């Protein structure tokens, strides 16, 4: 039976401000990328989300970011390697403490937003993130954009990696994510998205924004928790996968 991981960005609420529906998403996904306080999330909310993930058997990952709450971590920063290494260590360390208190462990790291996009092709910042992960826990898996150079860089440094595709994002013919600033970059039709993800899981291909077919080898699929209709999209993907005999299972289950 074909199997693939389904992940979502969670724990991003802050105080009275609510982002997404963590409880609903945790009933659907197999892995949860938990905010670590740098782009979103407060201690009580992060703890609550990690506890809920542990109770549901969902694997927990550290969703590390640039220090940018105002910009929700979506603004690019020219951080030095020293700063970035320390930021990564700090965030993973914080989530490890929360996870221990909640009776679970942090199994992987997925950078967020601008940091995720930057390190996909920026070797200097990518190496800093890798060095930060290795400094605190070299057993952690790095999740990154499928087909991006960061995955090879991490492998060469001795880290295990997982390639990720995005359910609700359009792709360029080169296999990169279409910028959110461009029309059609974010997808909203749950049925069409689910059909695309079945194609990805079965054939390892997707239709790019220009209609061409591109190769995407991914072991995990992300549904952004803050996207409009995120829960409905995730539910439809899960329904289609179950109907087509595709198992939803965290990549960490095999490690």
Curated annotation (Swiss-Prot):
Statement: the UniProt record of this protein carries the keyword Nucleotide-binding: yes
GO molecular function terms noted in the UniProt entry: 5-oxoprolinase (ATP-hydrolyzing) activity; ATP binding
EC number: 3.5.2.9
Spans through the membrane: none
Keyword set, alphabetical order: ATP-binding, Hydrolase, Nucleotide-binding
EC class (word): hydrolase
Catalysis performed (reactions): 5-oxo-L-proline + ATP + 2 H2O = L-glutamate + ADP + phosphate + H(+)
Pfam families: LamB_YcsF (PF03746)
A GO biological process held by the record: carbohydrate metabolic process
Family: Belongs to the LamB/PxpA family.
Assembly information from the UniProt record: Forms a complex composed of PxpA, PxpB and PxpC.
Purpose: Catalyzes the cleavage of 5-oxoproline to form L-glutamate coupled to the hydrolysis of ATP to ADP and inorganic phosphate.
Name of protein: 5-oxoprolinase subunit A 1
Organism for this UniProt entry: Agrobacterium fabrum (strain C58 / ATCC 33970)
Lineage, highest ranks first: Bacteria, Pseudomonadati, Pseudomonadota, Alphaproteobacteria, Hyphomicrobiales
């Amino acid at each position: 039976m074909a199997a693939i991981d389904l992940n979502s960005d969670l724990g991003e609420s802050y105080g009275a401000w609510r982002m997404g529906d963590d409880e609903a998403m945790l009933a659907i996904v197999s892995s949860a990328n938990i905010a670590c306080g740098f782009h979103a999330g407060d201690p009580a909310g992060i703890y609550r989300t990690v506890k809920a993930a542990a109770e549901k058997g969902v694997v927990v990952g550290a969703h590390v970011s640039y220090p940018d709450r105002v910009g929700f971590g979506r603004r690019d920063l020219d951080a030095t390697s020293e700063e970035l290494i320390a930021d990564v260590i700090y965030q993973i360390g914080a989530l490890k403490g929360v996870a221990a208190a909640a009776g679970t462990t942090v199994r992987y790291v997925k950078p967020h937003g601008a940091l995720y996009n930057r390190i996909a092709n920026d070797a200097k910042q990518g190496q800093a993130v890798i060095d930060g992960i290795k400094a605190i826990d070299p057993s952690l898996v790095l999740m990154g954009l499928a087909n991006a150079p960061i995955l090879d860089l991490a492998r060469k440094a001795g880290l295990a990696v997982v390639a990720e595709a995005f359910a609700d994002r359009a792709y360029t013919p080169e296999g990169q994510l279409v910028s959110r600033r461009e029309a059609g970059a974010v997808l909203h039709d749950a049925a069409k998205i689910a059909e695309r993800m079945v194609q990805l899981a079965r054939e390892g291909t997707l239709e790019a924004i220009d209609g061409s077919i591109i190769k995407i080898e991914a072991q995990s699929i992300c549904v952004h928790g803050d996207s409009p209709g995120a829960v409905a999209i995730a539910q439809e993907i899960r329904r289609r996968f179950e109907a087509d005999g595709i198992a939803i299972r965290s990549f960490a289950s095999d490690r």
